[in-house]
Amino acid sequence: IGFTADLGDKVIPNIVGVDIGCGMLTTQIPTDVGTIDFKNLDEVIRNNVPAGRNVCDEIINFEELEELHCFHQLKNIEWIRRSLGTLGGGNHFIEVDTDSKGTNYLVIHTGSRNLGKQVAEIYQKIAIEDMQGTDKLETEIQKLVKKYKHSGRRKEIQNGIDELKRKWKPDKLGIPKELCYLTGEHRKQYLHDMKICQEFARINRRCIQSAIFYTMNWTLQRNTWFDTIHNYIDHDTNIVRKGAISAKYGEKVLIPMNMRDGCIIAVGKGNEDWNCSAPHGAGRIMSRSKAKENISLEEFKESMDGIYTTSVQKSTIDESPMAYKPPQEIIDNIKDTVEIVDIIKPIYNFKASE
C-alpha cells in the first residue's frame, strides 16, 4: 500500500490525508529488563496512555501550535493540547516485539490526532475556494471597501459587500473537490503547518514512549530508537508519501504487517524508481465492515494465540490479521526498495477497543 509522487508547485491536502505525520516509533527495550510482566505493562498502558477518543487530563505544552497559519481556525484548542501522549484508535497500536536474537522492541504507532485532521480539512476547504475563484471575490471586496472609505460612504460598506457576495458565482471546478489543490502562498502556508503537525505527531509518540519507560522503570538509552513516518511531504525532495515511508539509502525503517505476524525491520536502498520510498504497512484485503461481517471473534482469538493481549474483542475484529494482506506478499514485493534485516514478532499487543 502507498502512494508517492512529486506534485511540483501544487499540493493536494487530501492526498497527504488527515493523520499528518503518522508513524511508528521503534525503541529497543534494555536487555537488563529480563522477562516482561505483560499484565503489569497492559495496566501501565491503560492507566497512562489514553486511547480511542480519550485525551490526557493535563496539558503537555507544545509552543509551536500557535505558529500555525491556520491556528485561529482551529476548534477546541484545549482538546488538541490534551491530545499529546494519546494513542487514538483504528490501526494505531502499542506492541512489544522480539527479534531473531531475542532483543525486545517497543513499537508505537500513532500520529497527529485531531490536529492533523483539522489542518487537513481547513486547507482542503481553502483549495476548493481558491479553485472556485474566491480570491477574486476577496479582491473585489477590498476594492469596494477602499472606494467607499475614500468617498465617505462607510455606512454603505456592509450592504455593498453583501451585494457582491449575492452576485458572485463560483468558477466551475472541472475536478472533484477531493482533488482540489493549493498553489502559491496557500501552498507555502500548508507546507509550514504540515511540518508543525509532523512535529506534533513525533512528540506524541515520544510522550507515550516516555510514559511507558518511566512507569515500567525501564532505562531509556541513547540511540536506541528510530521513527518511521508516513502521510507527509518530504521538504527536501518535494515527494508526497501517503501510506508510504522514506527508504533513502542506508535509512533504517519499520514496516508493520499485522498484529500476529509483526513488523519488518529493513534498510532503504535509495531506489529512485520507487521515489526512495516503501509501503508503510501491509494494506488491507478486507474493509473494516467486511472484516466484521466475515471474521468471527473465535477466529480472531485463535490467530492471536501465544501473544499477550487484552484487545481481542468484537470491536477490534476489523484489525485482525486476516483483514490484512499476507506477510509473504509484502516481503516479496519490497525487495527492490529495502534490504530486510529482521522480522520482529509480537509478544504483546495493545489497540484501543470500545
Model region roles, listed by residue range:
Residues I60-N61:
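Acidic, glycine-rich loop-and-strand cores that form catalytic or ligand-binding grooves
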